[in-house]
Amino acid sequence: MARMTAEARRAELVQAAFRVMSREGVGAGTTRAICAEAGMVLATFHYCFRSRDELLRELMIMLSLKERVAATEAMKPGSDMRELLRQASYGYLEHLEEDPGHELVLFELNHYALRSPELRDLADEQYRRYYESATQILEGAAQLADVSWSVELPALARIVVAMIDGLTTTWLVDRDSDRSKEVIDMLSEYVSSKAVPN
């Protein structure tokens, strides 16, 4: 059997952390549990990561990237702004439906970080990434639809993040995708009203 590189071990430990936390919650993601899930000895963890916090940061980055990809890949050239926003949000909703554990882990990581002074910056970083993703999606949609934004993009991105956060939480509770699509349609209508033709 081929020897794993340090990078491959890191990636496997991050995936193992996700599996454990998705099944049992962030609190269950101890270094021991993660190593057991990955089929590695504890010393391997300390060889690959300086701390559990470093692994949590990498996990958060990986999960946030998957959300962005789900939204951006759903946007189709030739659509108007409202439709592009619907497509991106529906792409995210499909991602949520397919893997609710993904979002539960992100929410738990955020709450865990907010209660841990040494991890407070992790919560800040998570939302910086959300705002960056929303901004990039809005910029990409504006390019595809050949429009400009009539309001400051950081404020609009913040509105989108707040609405998607709320949509995610309510969907995790009630699993009502039809209602979530109604919210997406209203959000898309509102946000697209802030676009003006070039």
Feature-to-residue mapping (PLM):
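All-alpha amphipathic helical-bundle segments outside canonical DNA-binding/catalytic cores
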Residues: 121-126, 143-159
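C-terminal peripheral helix-coil segments that are non-catalytic and often amphipathic
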Residues: 131-140, 163, 169-198
